[in-house]
């Protein structure tokens, strides 16, 4: 018998005035997976997660968390979930240890405060005031507050936004350790590398709807192209899109201002004829970059916009 889903969302809608924050969203998150909600700011990710956390009310649709619903089972659900908000405001004057003892007192069971402090690598800071912690330490502290009740399901809203690369990787390690214990994680992010590393499956959300769903590998494979060539040209005649599409191995052509993007199968198949074409037109590359296709490219190909655009 398949395990019941950790989170089940059907026909979820939420309006703020005339704005549709969430517009008929359907999702099912399996027990034990790390699931990513991916999308630009304003896509409806945070609203969806807040409704799942019981912090916000849907206008219509059903949301079932761990087989329960907030309207009838809030007291049962609260101790079973952990929540790390986009910005967690903790009492600045309390120490790390005092804060975690306070949060631990809200739950019947769970790990000791010492265990959690060790897990999030804040042993050396246990007597420091929360206000003295760095950005990365504060994010690990927020995660510790979410873990102290030993949750079955962990909600992380943009857990590494604003962190330096080292702090981001430390937090990724902690999330992976939590998932390795068979727990479920729902995270929102607009960092593609984060989603590709942590998530078993992702849903790409835009304008409050799921526009793509699958493993990171499946979604990238759906592009049909392994590489992206990005270039700008020196002054001169620019080839038109049809000429570019006629080159070997080109699946799609996009333009953003002066920049031209080609989604291609193999570099050796496309670059030599591209160089010949540009030479014939009396122009050349002002700038040239290539990268392996990512979830960012999937999003751009679906929406025509970058994930980082406000």
Where are these regions (language model features)?
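ABC-family P-loop ATPase nucleotide-binding domain
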Residues: 1-13, 305-310
């Amino acid at each position: 018998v398949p395990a019941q889903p950790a989170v089940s969302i059907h026909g979820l809608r939420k309006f703020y005035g005339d704005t549709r924050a969430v517009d008929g969203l359907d999702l099912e998150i399996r027990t034990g997976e790390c699931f990513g909600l991916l999308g630009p700011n304003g896509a409806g990710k945070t609203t969806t997660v807040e409704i799942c956390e019981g912090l916000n009310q849907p206008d219509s649709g059903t949301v079932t968390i761990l087989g329960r619903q907030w309207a009838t089972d809030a007291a049962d659900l609260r101790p079973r979930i952990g929540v790390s908000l986009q910005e967690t405001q903790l009492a600045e004057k309390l120490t790390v240890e005092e804060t975690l003892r306070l949060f631990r007192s809200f739950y019947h069971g769970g790990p000791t405060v010492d265990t959690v402090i060790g897990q999030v690598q804040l042993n050396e800071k246990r007597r420091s005031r929360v206000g003295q912690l760095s950005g990365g330490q504060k994010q690990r502290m927020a995660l510790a507050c979410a873990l102290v009740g030993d949750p079955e399901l962990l909600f992380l809203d943009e857990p590494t936004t604003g962190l330096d690369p080292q702090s981001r990787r430390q937090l990724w390690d902690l999330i992976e350790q939590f998932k390795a214990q068979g727990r479920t994680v729902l995270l929102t992010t607009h960092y593609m590398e984060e989603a590709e590393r942590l998530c078993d499956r992702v849903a790409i959300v835009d304008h409050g709807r799921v526009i793509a769903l699958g493993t990171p590998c499946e979604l990238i494979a759906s592009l049909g192209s392994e590489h992206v060539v990005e270039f700008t040209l020196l002054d001169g005649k620019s080839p038109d899109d049809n000429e570019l599409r006629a080159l070997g191995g080109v699946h799609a052509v996009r333009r953003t201002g002066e920049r031209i993007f080609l989604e291609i199968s193999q570099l050796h198949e496309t670059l030599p004829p591209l160089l010949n074409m540009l030479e014939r037109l009396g122009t050349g590359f002002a700038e040239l970059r290539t990268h392996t296709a990512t979830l960012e490219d999937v999003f751009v190909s679906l929406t025509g916009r970058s994930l980082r655009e406000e």
